[in-house]
UniProtKB/Swiss-Prot annotation:
One of its GO terms (biological process) is DNA replication initiation. Belongs to the ORC3 family. It comes from the Eukaryota. One of its GO terms (molecular function) is DNA replication origin binding. CDD domains: Orc3. Residues 662-671 have a biased composition (Acidic residues). The keyword Nucleus applies. Component of the origin recognition complex (ORC) that binds origins of replication. DNA-binding is ATP-dependent, however specific DNA sequences that define origins of replication have not been identified so far. ORC is required to assemble the pre-replication complex necessary to initiate DNA replication. This is Origin recognition complex subunit 3. The keyword DNA-binding applies. Residues 672-688, 875-896 have a biased composition (Low complexity).
Length: 1080
C-alpha cells in the first residue's frame, strides 16, 4: 500500500509510531522503531551500547538476500551498474531526490540534510565502503568470542591501554578474514570490488568539489547584497543604555514611547523562484552581522563574539500552516541548542527569558567587568602621579564612575526570522505573527526578512494595511538567474575542475535552463545527476585512477600564493631511487624516460629573459628517437612525424625493453636542431641511467603488451589490469601527465579566446555561456570573422598593433601556459589511427609552449624587440632571397619583351603601365612577425583546443555517454502538457488495444475521440457541434442518445478539470482553448 515503509532487513511493515522496548541489560524502557516480525533478540540502550544484536539465522538470510539483489541489478564488472528504477529506489546511497521538488538549492529541515544534493552520500548498504571498515550489514560482531569481550571489558576497567590495542588488533584480523570471504561471495574477484569502491569514492570527491566550487561562487556573487543586508540588520535598532537593558531583562519596565515609534525592521529580498542564493546568503549573514555589532560595542576588542552573533531561523509555510505551529517552531528552533529544561513551554514569555539569560545579562556583566578593569588601571596611574590629593579625589571618582557607567550605550543582538515563499503564506497566520513580534520587540529585537519571487506589490496583497504599517521595510534585489548561470559557467569551465563537461551535456543544461525552468538549482541538480549516472552506468572511470601523485600547481596572478607549477609523478610503493619527480624549470633528469625542461627556473623574470633558441627537447629514451622525427617549421612550432618502423621490429612492452636496444639507438641522426643543446644534459645524467634501470626493472608488468594497456585506457577493465600496475608503468605516467597538462591549460585557452573576441570585436553583450554554446554547436562564424579581420584587414582601425596591445595586457595567460606545458613528456605511441590523438596532444602542447615563448619578444623594448624579431625572420629572408632571385630573372626577361613592345606605345599607355608596376612599401619586420604570431594564436590555440570534440581526447572525463544522458534527461524533462496531448491522441498505443487502429475511429476511448475533435477546431468550439461530431463517429448517426450525452459530458468535464478548456462569457454554448494543444 502507498505510504507504508518496509523493513530493509525482513521486508516487514515498519510501524509509524515509536514502540516501547526494554533494554536487556539495564531493563530501562526506550523508544524504538521496529518491524512487525520482531527480528531482534535483544536491544541495548545508548547507555549500554548502540549495537543492535540480531539473530544468526537472520544475518545469514540477509546476506543471501543482498546477494540476490546485486545479481539481478548489476551487469558487466562494476558491481553497481544501476538502472533508473534502482536509483530512484533510494538504495545504495543514492537518494530519490524528493527534496528537490520545490526547486530549492538547500533543504529546509535539518533531518533531511543528509539527503541533500551537496551532502555526503550515505554509505553503500550492501557492501563495505573500504576493505578495513566494518559494515553493520555484515555479521561480523558475533564472530568475536564472548571471552574476548569479557577480557576486553576487564582491561578497560583496569585502564591498560597496551592490552586493549592488542585485543583490538585481534578483532580486526578476525573481522578482516570474514570480510574478505564475504566480498568474494558477493563480487567474485576482489579487484572488481576494489574498482567499484574507487568509482564510488571518485563520485563522492566530484560531488564534494562541485559543492565547494558553487559555495565559492555564491560568496563572490553575493558580496554586495551581503554587505547591504548586514548593515541594515546590525543598525536596525537604536542603541540603549546599560541600565535600560538591565531593567528590560529584569522586566522592571515595559515598552517605552521610543519603542513604539520604531517598527519591526523588515528586509524584502526580491528573488526569482527557487533561488539557491537566499539560503547561501543567510548562512553568511550571522558572522557578518556579528563583526559589525561588535565594532559598535564599547570595549569591542574584548567582548565575546557569541554574545554579538544573531540567532537565525528559517520559517517555511509547509511547516507553519497554523499560528500555534508557527510559534512553537520559533521557540523550539531558538532554544534547541540551550538547556531546554529552563524553557519547557513553547511560549514567547519563556523566549524572552531565554534572550535575557543568554544575551542581555551576560553582555551587561561582561561590560561591567571590562569597565572595572579599565577604571582600576586608570586609578593606578593617577595614584602614582597624585599621591597627596588621593583622599579628596576618591569621592569624586566614585561619582564619576556611576555617571560613566550609566552613559554606556550598547547594541542589542537581533534575532533574524527568514520567511520563505512569502506569497504562499496564510495571510491570517502571518498577520498574527507580526502582531506578536511587534508586542515583544522591546524585549527581543526581532528582524524579519521576506523572500518575494513575484512583483513588488505582493506584500500588500498578502498583508492588510494595518499590519504593513508595523514594518520598517527595506528592499534588496538579488542577482537574476541568468547572471547566476553565467557565474556558474565561469566556475565550471574557467576554473580547474577534476572533470570536463562535454558538449552534449552542456547543451542540455543550457537549453533546459533557457527554455524550460530558468532555475539554477535545477541546473545544479541535473549536473549532479550527470556525475552520479556517469559513475554508476559506465565502467571504471579515469577519475578513479590514483592521481594523488600527479599534482599541477597552476596559479593565477590574482592568487596570493607564489610558486612554480609542478607535476610530480611518484609511483606507488616505490623506493626512493625509483621516484620520478619532475619540476618545471629544472633540467634534472632522474628517469631516463623523462623529458628535460628549460634550464632556467620557472619564474616570470626568467621566462622573459630566456630565448626561444634555448628551448630543449629531450626524448624519453633513444628508443623513441627511431620512432619520431622532429622538425622545425617556419612558425617555430615543433611537429612530430612518425617514421615507418621496420617490419621485423615489434612494439615491445616494458619487460621486453632490454639494454641491448640502446646499442641500435646510437646511430640515430634524425633529431631536431634544438636537441643539440641536450647532449650536455645527457652526459651529466649518464651516471644515473643504471640506477634508473634497476629501480624500474622489477616493477614492469610481466607478459603484458603496452598496446593492450593503451587499448584499456578509455574504460579500464579491472579484471585484467589493476590500478597498482598502471601507476608503476612509466609510459602511462607520461601519458597521464600530458593529459593533465592538456586539461589544465584548456581553461586558459578559453579565457584568452574570450578576451580577444570580446574586446577586439567590441561586443559588450558577449557572454561565456553563449560562447560555449557556439563552441558546442561547432559554430565557427565568430572564429572565422576574427581570423579574417586579423589577416585580411591589417590596415583597418582595429589594426594588428591594437590587438597586440590587448595581448600584452593578457600576459599572465601566456605565463600560465608556459608553466603548464614545460612538464611535457614525449609519449611513444603505436602507428595506428586509434592513437593519433595522443600525438596531436603532444604536438599541440609543444606549439602552445613555443608560441608562449615567442610572445616574450613582443614584450621587449623596441630596440631589443627589433633585434630579436630580425633574428627570428632571418631564416625566412634567406629563403625569400632565393625566390626573389629566380623571380628577378623571370622579370628581367619579361621586361625586355615589354621594352621592345613599348616603342610603339602612346604616352598615356606608358603612364598606366608605370602606375601598375609601382612597388608597394613592404611591411616592417614587426608587422610580419606579429601577423604570423597572431595567425598561430588564433589557428593553433583556438581551433585545436576548443572546437574539436572532447571525445577525441583520450582519458578526458566526459558525461555525454548516450545511455547516461538519456537516463538523466528522463528525470528532468517534465513536459506534462505534451504527455497528456500524446497519450490522448495515441491512446491505442498506451492501451495496446488490438481491435482499434491508430487513427480516429468509433472504437477508441471517449476521451481520445473528443480530444481529437477539439484539436481540429479553432480557438473556440461550439458545444452542440462538438457533441454531434462525437455521436457521428461512434454511431454514424448525428442524433445523440442519452448514453452518448453522458459519455460526452464526462469527457468535457475532464478537460475542464485539466484546464485544457474553459467556458466563455461572450459566446454562449462555446468553449475556449486554454493550453497550447497541437496535433501529432
Amino acid at each position: 500500500m502507498a505510504g507504508e515503509n518496509y523493513c530493509s532487513v525482513c521486508e516487514g511493515i515498519i510501524s509509524t509510531e515509536n514502540d516501547l522496548a526494554v533494554c536487556y541489560k539495564c531493563k530501562e524502557e526506550i523508544f524504538h522503531k521496529a518491524c512487525g516480525k520482531k527480528v531482534f533478540d535483544s536491544l541495548r540502550c545508548l547507555n549500554c551500547g548502540p549495537i543492535e544484536k540480531r539473530s544468526l539465522s537472520h544475518q545469514i538470510g540477509e546476506i543471501s538476500k543482498g546477494k540476490a539483489k546485486l545479481e539481478t541489478r548489476t551487469s558487466r564488472f562494476t558491481g553497481i551498474n544501476v538502472t533508473k528504477e534502482f536509483i530512484e529506489s533510494g538504495e545504495y546511497g543514492i537518494s530519490k531526490g524528493d527534496d528537490d521538488d520545490d526547486g530549492d538549492y538547500v533543504g529546509g529541515d535539518d533531518s533531511s540534510s543528509d539527503d541533500e544534493y551537496f551532502g555526503n552520500p550515505t554509505v553503500l548498504n550492501n557492501y563495505p565502503t573500504t576493505m578495513n571498515n566494518v559494515d553493520l550489514n555484515f555479521p561480523t560482531f558475533f564472530l568475536l568470542n564472548e571471552d574476548m569481550k569479557k577480557r576486553k571489558q576487564k582491561i578497560k576497567e583496569d585502564g591498560n591501554n597496551e592490552e586493549i590495542k592488542k585485543i583490538e588488533q585481534e578483532e580486526k584480523m578476525i573481522i578482516q578474514e570474514y570480510q574478505n570471504e564475504e566480498i568474494l561471495k558477493f563480487f567474485g574477484d576482489r579487484s572488481c570490488f576494489k574498482q567499484t569502491q574507487l568509482a564510488y569514492e571518485a563520485m563522492v570527491q566530484c560531488l564534494k568539489d562541485l559543492k565547494e566550487s558553487i559555495e565559492r561562487m555564491f560568496k563572490v556573487v553575493s558580496v554586495k547584497t551581503l554587505g547591504d543586508i548586514s548593515s541594515f540588520i546590525s543598525m536596525s535598532y537604536p542603541k540603549k543604555s546599560l541600565l535600560d537593558i538591565r531593567d528590560i531583562a529584569l522586566e522592571l519596565i515595559g515598552q517605552s514611547i521610543d519603542d513604539s515609534i520604531h517598527h519591526i525592521p523588515t528586509s524584502i529580498l526580491y528573488t526569482s523562484s527557487s533561488s539557491p542564493e537566499v539560503a547561501q546568503l543567510f548562512q553568511s549573514v550571522p558572522s557578518n552581522v556579528m563583526m559589525r555589532i561588535k565594532s559598535h560595542q564599547p570595549f569591542s576588542s574584548d567582548i565575546s563574539s557569541h554574545l554579538c552573533e544573531p540567532p537565525t531561523i528559517t520559517l517555511n509555510p509547509d511547516c507553519c500552516n497554523t499560528f500555534k505551529s508557527t510559534v512553537s517552531t520559533i521557540c523550539h528552533s531558538l532554544t534547541k541548542d540551550y538547556d531546554v529544561t529552563k524553557f519547557p513551554s513553547p511560549h514567547f514569555e519563556d523566549l524572552s527569558r531565554w534572550y535575557s539569560n543568554y544575551f542581555s545579562i551576560p553582555l551587561i556583566q561582561e561590560v561591567i567587568e571590562l569597565f572595572k578593569q579599565q577604571q582600576q588601571q586608570q586609578q593606578q596611574q593617577q595614584q602614582q602621579q597624585q599621591q597627596q590629593q588621593q583622599q579628596q579625589q576618591q569621592q569624586q571618582q566614585q561619582q564619576q564612575q556611576k555617571d560613566k557607567l550609566e552613559e554606556i550605550m550598547l547594541v542589542r543582538t537581533p534575532v533574524i526570522l527568514v520567511i520563505e515563499d512569502f506569497e504562499t503564506w496564510n495571510s491570517e497566520v502571518l498577520s498574527d505573527l507580526i502582531h506578536l513580534l511587534s508586542a515583544y520587540r522591546h524585549r527581543i529585537p526581532f528582524v524579519l526578512s521576506f523572500s518575494i519571487s513575484t512583483s513588488a506589490d505582493a506584500i500588500h496583497k498578502v498583508l492588510p494595511y494595518q499590519v504593513v504599517s508595523l514594518l520598517n521595510l527595506k528592499s534588496l534585489h538579488l542577482r537574476s538567474q541568468n547572471e547566476m548561470f553565467e557565474q556558474l559557467v565561469k566556475h565550471l569551465f574557467l576554473k580547474s575542475q577534476p572533470y570536463i563537461i562535454s558538449k552534449k551535456a552542456y547543451l542540455y543544461l543550457y537549453y533546459n535552463f533557457k527554455n524550460s525552468y530558468m532555475s539554477l538549482s535545477t541546473t545544479i541538480s541535473v549536473l549532479r545527476h550527470f556525475i552520479i549516472d556517469h559513475f554508476l552506468e559506465n565502467g571504471l572511470s579515469y577519475l578513479t585512477l590514483d592521481l594523488s601523485n600527479f599534482q599541477i600547481d597552476l596559479k593565477d596572478d590574482d592568487d596570493d600564493m607564489d610558486g612554480c607549477s609542478t607535476i610530480k609523478l611518484e609511483p606507488e610503493n616505490d623506493s626512493t631511487d625509483s621516484t620520478v619527480n619532475d619540476e618545471v624549470g629544472t633540467g634534472d633528469n632522474i628517469d631516463n624516460d623523462n623529458v628535460s625542461t628549460h634550464g632556467e627556473e620557472d619564474t616570470p623574470d626568467s621566462l622573459v629573459k630566456s630565448d626561444i633558441e634555448c628551448q630543449t627537447l629531450s626524448y624519453s629514451s633513444d628508443d623513441e628517437r627511431n620512432d619520431y622525427d622532429t622538425s622545425t617549421d617556419s612558425d617555430n612550432c615543433s611537429n612530430f612525424h612518425k617514421k615507418k618502423p621496420n617490419s621485423n621490429n615489434r612494439i615491445k612492452s616494458d619487460l621486453e625493453c632490454n639494454d641491448n636496444d640502446k646499442d641500435n639507438d646510437d646511430n640515430d641522426n634524425d633529431i631536431n636542431e634544438n636537441n643539440n643543446n641536450i647532449n650536455n644534459n645527457n652526459n651529466n645524467n649518464s651516471n644515473n641511467d643504471d640506477n634508473d634501470k634497476d629501480s624500474f626493472g622489477p616493477k614492469r608488468i610481466p607478459n603484458q603488451r603496452f598496446v593492450t594497456l593503451i587499448q584499456k585506457l578509455p574504460s579500464l577493465n579491472t579484471d585484467e589490469i589493476e590500478n597498482s600496475k598502471i601507476s608503476t608503468n612509466r609510459k602511462l605516467n607520461k601519458l597521464q601527465s600530458n593529459l593533465i597538462i592538456f586539461k589544465e591549460s584548456r581553461p586558459i585557452m578559453l579565457e584568452l579566446y574570450y578576451t580577444i573576441l570580446s574586446k577586439f570585436q567590441k561586443s559588450k553583450t558577449l557572454k561565456y555561456s553563449e560562447l560555449l554554446k557556439k563552441i558546442s554547436l561547432n559554430d565557427r562564424k565568430s572564429y572565422e570573422t576574427l581570423r579574417k579581420t586579423i589577416l585580411t584587414n591589417p590596415e583597418s582601425k582595429q589594426s594588428i598593433e591594437t590587438l597586440l596591445d590587448l595581448l600584452k595586457t593578457s600576459r599572465h595567460h601566456f605565463e600560465r601556459i608556459i608553466k603548464a606545458t614545460n612538464s611535457l613528456k614525449l609519449f611513444q605511441t603505436p602507428k595506428s589511427k586509434k592513437y593519433q590523438d595522443l600525438v596531436k596532444i603532444e604536438n599541440l602542447i609543444l606549439k602552445c609552449r613555443t608560441l608562449s615563448n615567442n610572445f616574450k619578444n613582443l614584450l621587449l623594448p623596441p630596440d631589443e624587440q627589433s633585434k630579436s624579431i630580425k633574428n627570428e625572420i632571418k631564416q625566412q629572408q634567406q629563403q625569400q632571397q632565393q625566390q626573389q632571385q629566380q623571380q628577378q630573372q623571370q622579370q628581367h626577361q619579361q621586361q625586355q619583351k615589354i621594352e621592345n613592345e613599348q616603342k610603339n606605345w602612346s604616352i598615356k599607355k606608358k603612364r598606366e603601365h608605370q602606375l601598375r608596376n609601382i612597388q608597394k612599401p613592404t611591411d616592417s619586420y614587426f608587422k610580419i612577425y606579429s601577423r604570423e604570431f597572431l595567425d598561430d594564436i588564433v589557428s593553433v590555440i583556438i581551433e585545436d583546443y576548443l572546437y574539436p570534440p572532447l571525445v577525441s581526447v583520450p582519458l578526458s572525463e566526459i558525461f555525454d555517454f548516450t545511455q547516461t544522458v538519456f537516463i538523466t534527461q528522463s528525470r528532468f524533462n517534465f513536459h506534462t502538457a505534451e504527455g497528456i496531448n500524446d497519450n490522448l491522441i495515441h491512446s491505442v498505443r498506451k492501451l495496446k488495444c488490438e481491435c482499434c487502429i491508430d487513427s480516429l475511429c468509433g472504437t477508441m476511448d471517449d476521451f481520445s475521440i473528443s480530444f481529437i475533435l477539439l484539436l481540429r477546431s479553432g480557438r473556440y468550439i461550439n458545444y452542440f457541434d462538438w457533441l454531434t461530431s462525437f455521436c457521428s463517429i461512434i454511431n454514424g448517426d448525428n442524433n445523440p442518445t442519452p448514453n452518448l450525452k453522458a459519455r460526452f459530458i464526462k469527457s468535457v468535464d475532464t478537460f475542464v478539470s485539466l484546464e485544457l478548456i474553459k467556458k466563455t462569457r461572450k459566446r454562449k454554448d462555446h468553449f475556449e482553448k486554454i493550453a497550447f494543444l497541437t496535433t501529432s
